[in-house]
């Protein structure tokens, strides 16, 4: 399936933003944050069940992603790569929460 011009343009914007962020430009980080926050918040909330925990997960996920941005091989795939980080961060948070509840019962 061929990608639309809009999809291609968006992918190019992500590639440019990642390159910009890696070069130390705040604008690159701002674009990556602003263009992914809504959708990734929805993912985090689906896992966590409430806004506060979802925001915590998302904050942790952004820190991880921006710290490891240099490991991303295909800059155009930032949204998918970041989505995986959000999901994994949420799963880890749920496991910690579950362990904490179990520990409190003992």
Task: Show where each model-derived region lies.
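Phosphate-coordinating loops and pocket residues in cytosolic domains that bind phosphorylated ligands
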Residues: 34, 59, 83, 95-96
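Hydrophobic side chains within well-formed alpha-helices
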Residues: 14-17, 28-29, 57, 78, ...
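Hydrophobic/aromatic residues within well-ordered alpha-helical segments
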Residues: 32-36, 40, 86
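Structural recognition of an alpha-helix C-terminal capping motif at a helix-to-coil junction
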Residues: 42, 56-63, 76-88
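Short, charged helix-capping/linker segments at alpha-helix termini
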Residues: 3-5, 22-31, 41-60
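Arg/Lys-rich amphipathic alpha helix in sigma70-family domain 2
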Residues: 70-73, 87-105
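Intrinsic, short, N-terminal disordered tails of RNA polymerase sigma-factor systems
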Residues: 1-16
